[in-house]
């Protein structure tokens, strides 16, 4: 029984493989963008390289989907809603995010200390990062001396802060809750767009309110998926195959959103305008593939493994590329101008290969040396 079976494998309503697929695609897109920034090596998919930074938007939507899915399933099955005591929820989220993050932050701090020496600015930067508030202060956000990609953790932390309130509200009153979140993003985005062209806009367009609608899309996608995943139609091949085809169509839509973003004349301005279409395309892809034909078990296992690595990979890839290029001058170069800016295509190719290899190697070391052992200790998990 598998992807070509006339009697499809039952839908996994609790952990759809489509969520792992989207997580891997989003993490790859972000890394493709950051490594391309350093190497300038073209993969032939220029729009994904140029617009890959908005993979963050996909990760935000996906986080809302995955966290809310147990609530959506309980609502659909008529079961009691999951317990969500804030203290327990915050403890679980901290155990999931902080060990790998603090290990990465230590490395980032040591690199910054070597580059700049100890000073008050670095101390304040470190304090903001330790408390996950780095995005709230310009010096520790766009002016950080530490790992620049971790601003997203402020967005996630603020979402986790309100999730124990949002989850029961959305389960009991989905339309008003989703609508209110979308209105928050729409109102904030309109205000922020009026700041475009000023120095303030760069600080505004990725703040938490600018993602509230994206979070709403993720929670709505969980409700739709849960509603459809338990129907009698799921045992029939034709509708499941049709869902897979719709998932492919949604990916084409997502790819078009990426193309529009990549070639936008005003990239950051359009990023805020394009955020909801992008989130909707990704959510459609997530739901349709989740309801579609089940992937073979070996493929699902590989996707699950890659998805498990994605957090450490996200934390390490960009700072490693910058460290190798500017601190170690690898691949070897001299002078004040990096070879990619001089059109050295051989160096670009070598840099691209080196930065990806280093990111994957350090990700494996961080995951198996830090993230997984600590998770086993904190959660009592095996294997």
Say what each PLM segment does.
Residues 2-18, 32-52, 68-84, 138-141, ...:
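Alpha-helical transmembrane segments in multi-pass integral membrane proteins
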Residues 20, 24-27, 56-57, 63, ...:
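Residues within membrane-spanning alpha-helices of integral membrane proteins
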Residues 21-27, 63, 93, 99-102, ...:
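Conserved beta-strand->loop/alpha-helix structural units within folded catalytic cores of enzymes
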Residues 25-34, 174-194, 243-252:
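Small-polar-interrupted transmembrane alpha-helices in polytopic inner-membrane proteins
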Residues 26-29, 33-36, 62-65, 128, ...:
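Membrane-embedded alpha-helical transmembrane segments of multi-pass integral membrane proteins
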Residues 28, 102, 106-110, 114, ...:
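Generic alpha-helical transmembrane segments of integral inner-membrane proteins
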Residues 70, 83-91, 97-155, 186-202, ...:
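Membrane-interface helix-loop-helix regions
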